Regions:
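Short, small/polar-rich loop/turn modules that mediate ligand/substrate recognition or access, typified
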Residues: 95, 181, 186, 243-245
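Substrate-binding pocket helix/loop in short-chain dehydrogenase/reductase
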Residues: 105-106, 110-118, 213
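C-terminal substrate-recognition "lid" of short-chain dehydrogenase/reductases
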Residues: 126-129, 222-250
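Active-site helix of classical SDR
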Residues: 129, 165, 173
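Alpha-helical segment proximal to the catalytic Tyr-Lys
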Residues: 134, 178-182, 241
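Residue(s) in the substrate-gating loop at a strand-loop-helix junction
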Residues: 149
Length: 255
């Protein structure tokens, strides 16, 4: 256990995380379990999801629930959310983390690929929120945390569909926040910089990438998944009760 903040308001709170089996999502699930929250998470990577569930059961005795589900399948996602709420109680925290940042060129994008990128990076965030808002409203409030990206803010090339989807999340967050604020539901966006997940390191980090981070980040060092998870904990907890419709950037001072 680390020496960072403990949030009493998160104990026993029902939390739902998309894309929770690996990377940033894995860290988010882990940190909520350590806070004593009741966590359910979905992912398409069943082996990784089961491994995380078992590992946390052994580590903290507070095993999350893992359910294999593709966020692209809207009906299945909303059915999974209903199932979780029937068994665990009202979801008070939704973390829309699932995404796919595969690189792609302008000329390679088809209409089908474009729609798939919107589905995996944007569409599910709205429909997951749609599914949890009625319960949050009835319970007296909640926190919806969407994940954006630094990529569109800095004009990153090589993945136009991804950048478009992530740019739209800021508008989604602000629109939802205005609509549901009267129910004491907060909606915010977390904007990561270049986070050193296993996937990023394996696929894209090279010497030039290291030099770019050294040049562009105001802070030395590297962003790791736990840095994002700690921001998510704050936005989920009552400590951020008057924070809504905002972007919280964790980029080491890049943008």
């Amino acid at each position: 256990m680390d020496s960072y903040a403990i949030y009493p308001s998160l104990k026993d709170k029902v939390v739902f995380v998309t894309g929770g089996a690996t990377g940033i999502g894995e860290s988010i699930v882990t940190h909520f379990c350590r806070q004593g929250s009741k966590v359910a998470f979905v992912d398409i990577n069943a082996p990784a999801g089961e491994k995380l569930r078992a590992g946390l059961a052994a580590e903290v005795g507070n095993a999350p629930e893992f359910l294999r589900c593709s966020v692209i399948d809207t009906d299945a996602l909303q059915a999974t959310i209903r199932d979780v709420q029937e068994r665990l109680g009202v979801i008070r925290v939704l973390v829309n983390n699932a995404a796919n940042d595969d690189r792609h060129s302008i000329e390679s994008v088809t209409a089908q690929y474009w729609d798939e990128r919107m589905a995996v990076n944007l569409r599910h965030q709205f429909f997951a929120a749609q599914a949890v808002i009625p319960g949050m409203q009835q319970a007296g409030g909640g926190s919806i945390i969407n994940f954006g990206s630094l990529s569109w803010k800095v004009g990153m090339g090589g993945m136009p569909a991804y950048v478009t989807a992530k740019a739209a999340i800021g508008g989604l967050t602000r629109g939802l926040a205005r609509d549901v604020g009267k129910f004491n539901i907060r909606v915010n966006t977390v904007v990561p910089g270049w986070v050193m997940t296993d996937r990023q390191i394996r696929l894209w980090l090279d010497a030039e990438g290291e030099r770019t981070m050294d040049r562009m980040q105001s802070l030395a060092g590297r962003i790791v998944p736990d840095d994002l998870a700690r921001m998510v904990l704050f936005l989920a907890a009552d400590d951020s009760r008057m924070c809504s419709a905002q972007e919280f950037v964790v980029d080491a001072g890049w943008a």
